[in-house]
Amino acid sequence: MGISANLFVNQKGTTTALKQPKEIGYYSRNQTEEYLVSDDINLRYYYLPDQEIEHGIDLSAGASKFRDVAKDFKDRCSLKGLLDTLMEYEKKKNKKSNVDIITFRGIMSKLIRASMEPPNFNKVDLRIVSYDGQLFIKDVSDYNAATNESNSSGVNSRQQAGTSRQQIDTYTGYKFEGIATLDKPLPYVEREVIEKRPRKILNNGDEYITVVRTGVGECKVVLGAEIDCIFDFKEEGKDNLKHYTELKCSSQISTTNDVRRFEKKMFRAWLQCFLVGVPRVIYGFRDDQYMLKTVEEFSTEEIPVIIKANNPTLGQSCLDAIKWYGLFTDWLLKIIPREQSGNIRAYRLVYENNHLRLSEIEEQDGEYSRYVLEDGILTPEFKEWRESLRVPSEETPKAD
């Protein structure tokens, strides 16, 4: 019988030791589902002068023309770009990276938030494969259940019922990114391009993803994370985490309830940025008519202080999140065997009621072939690369 285990989310961890995030690579994904390693073609640059806001920016403009290309992707949660980037990094060093877990920031964020959000609000439906001494984790949630972490819930402009208010609320996030960024540094952009930003048709297919090595406690992690833009400039050939920025859009704050809702949004934004070392969040605030009214910048490291000053209970959640991060990663590493071999074992990890439930996918299971024998998570190229590192030699290189 396969492995099965539960982790109750009310447990409290003690680990607060964190590893400094370090960028080890990046890639771009385009509208045709291509993954371009070490290509920053989809990296954006922040530029939104005050006078543009004063002239009035309608964040709902163009919602009916939004191109929801991600819904047609063959595998929109694919690890291919992440694995290809990790493989390129390892080839430069000619050795396997010394890490325990490889996944996306959004998945790690979901798992952390499971300790403070119910499963109907935070759907966790993951598949894990244990291979070559490491765990590779993929989100297999339905498209409509995607969280706002990845900005991939989409706005389907093709629905016959038209564009709902909820869809427009989602769209304003894309719109804010569209009007606040450029595809090149400002000196290389023509004035005409800047002026046409409000009329640009947007899509959810183009992304720029950083690949970061980080960790908590004894667990070493590689995370892929979508980056909204560069705040100032990019340093070629260097770690650019300090230059990256998260962009968010929210309704204006008028009531006490608005304050509480925004504090929860800030916590999630902090968690996103904290996990991969993004140092700032820029919020655009809209009124009830979706007009952009103000823009405010927050330092990631100051957000817990801001939250705690207004809401001590929620402020404690930042520290609790780190402790839970350490607890559940340690649990995964202890429960799931990690053989230093080419053997693959697959598992389900779901969030039910008050616990995370892990169960092994056995040979008679309908998903076994996809995740163990085929490329449901691991690509043939990545497995071939790792197999090449196991070819006997006079001296086996140490892991990075």
Curated annotation (Swiss-Prot):
Enzyme Commission number, as recorded: 3.6.1.-
UniProt lineage: Eukaryota, Fungi, Dikarya, Ascomycota, Saccharomycotina
Protein residues bound to a divalent metal cation: E177, D228, E246, L247
Compartment(s): Nucleus
An example molecular function term from Gene Ontology annotations: mRNA 5'-diphosphatase activity
Name of the protein in its database record: Decapping nuclease RAI1
Group of enzyme by EC: hydrolase
Physiological role: Decapping enzyme for NAD-capped RNAs: specifically hydrolyzes the nicotinamide adenine dinucleotide (NAD) cap from a subset of RNAs by removing the entire NAD moiety from the 5'-end of an NAD-capped RNA. The NAD-cap is present at the 5'-end of some RNAs and snoRNAs. In contrast to the canonical 5'-end N7 methylguanosine (m7G) cap, the NAD cap promotes mRNA decay. Also acts as a non-canonical decapping enzyme that removes the entire cap structure of m7G capped or incompletely capped RNAs.
Major localization listed first in the record, in broad terms: nucleus
Assembly information from the UniProt record: Interacts with RAT1; the interaction is direct, stabilizes RAT1 protein structure and stimulates its exoribonuclease activity. The interaction also stimulates RAI1 pyrophosphohydrolase activity, probably by recruiting it to mRNA substrates.
A GO biological-process term: mRNA processing
Family, similarity comment: Belongs to the DXO/Dom3Z family.
InterPro entries referenced in this protein's UniProt entry, alphabetically: RAI1, RAI1-like_fam
Cofactor annotation: a divalent metal cation
Keyword Transcription (UniProt): no
Cofactor binding note of this UniProt entry: Divalent metal cation.
Entry GO CC: Las1 complex; RNA polymerase II termination complex
Chain positions recorded as substrate binding sites: E226, K248, Q272
PANTHER family in alphabetical order: DECAPPING AND EXORIBONUCLEASE PROTEIN, DOM-3 RELATED
Alphabetical keyword list: Hydrolase, Metal-binding, mRNA processing, Nuclease, Nucleotide-binding, Nucleus, RNA-binding
Reaction(s) catalysed by this chain's protein: a 5'-end NAD(+)-phospho-ribonucleoside in mRNA + H2O = a 5'-end phospho-ribonucleoside in mRNA + NAD(+) + H(+); a 5'-end (N(7)-methyl 5'-triphosphoguanosine)-ribonucleoside-ribonucleotide in mRNA + H2O = a (N(7)-methyl 5'-triphosphoguanosine)-nucleoside + a 5'-end phospho-ribonucleoside in mRNA + H(+); a 5'-end triphospho-ribonucleoside in mRNA + H2O = a 5'-end phospho-ribonucleoside in mRNA + diphosphate + H(+)
Top-level taxonomic group: Eukaryota
